[in-house]
Amino acid sequence: MMRRIFAIISALAIAVTATACGSTEPRSLVRSVDSGHVILGTKYDQPGLGMRNPDKTMTGLDVEVATYVVNHIADQRGVAHPEITWRETPSATRETVIKNGEVDMIAGTYSINASRAKSVNFGGPYLLTHQALLVRSDDHTLQSLQDLDKGRKLCSVTGSTPAQKVKKSLPGVQLQEYDSYSSCVEALHQKKVDAMTTDATILYGFALQYPGEFEVIEMTKEDGKPFTNEHYGLGLAKDDAESTEAINDAVRAMQDDGSFQAMVDKNLGENASVVEADEAGNLDFVKE
């Protein structure tokens, strides 16, 4: 009897261990589409890009892009549009949740760079934007990037790259990192920091959400070109070539049929000019 009980306990332990191990393996977007259910990561606090509303619905450009992509993949594979579960994915956690198999794909202002591309695959890019500053409208001492190089306090989000680029260029900046963009905006409102930096797409969304309180300052180099180019991609499991190509096909279709521009106009409104369609599958800009 005791042997039988021990055998049952051992079998259960093995099953639990196998399940736990399986949960840490990357997912396949294509397989999940075929199964009828996908888990998509995005931001919950970015006006115009990724927002979770009080009624728990999701809105924003990245939300619409991700939805179009998975539905297009389903159409191409002859299956029904999948049920979508949304998951909040802050900048600092994105590579981890992909590698652990917690999401199928992330669409969340996910700039493609060499460091991230070592850990995950990227579909796209689907959008090109640039870095900018958000300042208080009543602070007239900050009119350009160079004005920060006087011991001013600059806020950005942990796991995001823009502030590090500014710090490298302007050593006099005092860099402060917060866990979310909304926390950065609140710190700026309370005058705990002097400016916030990230992509122009994100900053214009916050400026619209708080009319009259903030303004966006463009960041340029001495030659007048943007301080950075930010290419947004769709993150997924490393080496998942099938899903990556399926995403790229969907992005091309989205741009060709006019859906992408319609999404941009709808979600970014008068600030639609801060983005342009990017070339899916072209990662030549990624440098070590």
Feature locations, PLM:
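Ligand-binding clefts/hinges and TM-proximal coupling segments of bilobed small-molecule sensing domains
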Residues: S23, P162-L175, E215-E218, A246-E288
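Periplasmic-binding protein-like
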Residues: Y44, L127-V135, L208-N248, E270-E288
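A ligand-binding cleft/hinge motif common to bilobed small-molecule-binding domains
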Residues: A92-T93, G108-S119, K165-K168, D194-T228
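Acidic, polar ligand-binding/catalytic clefts
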Residues: V79-D147
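Extended ligand-binding regions for polar small-molecule ligands
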Residues: G22, V63, T67-H72, D139, ...
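Bilobed "Venus flytrap"/periplasmic-binding protein-like clamshell domains
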Residues: D45-P47, M58-D75, Q131-E186, A200-I202
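Extracytoplasmic small-molecule ligand-binding "clamshell" domains
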Residues: S28-M105
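C-terminal motif of bacterial Sec signal peptides marking the signal peptidase cleavage site
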Residues: V16-A20
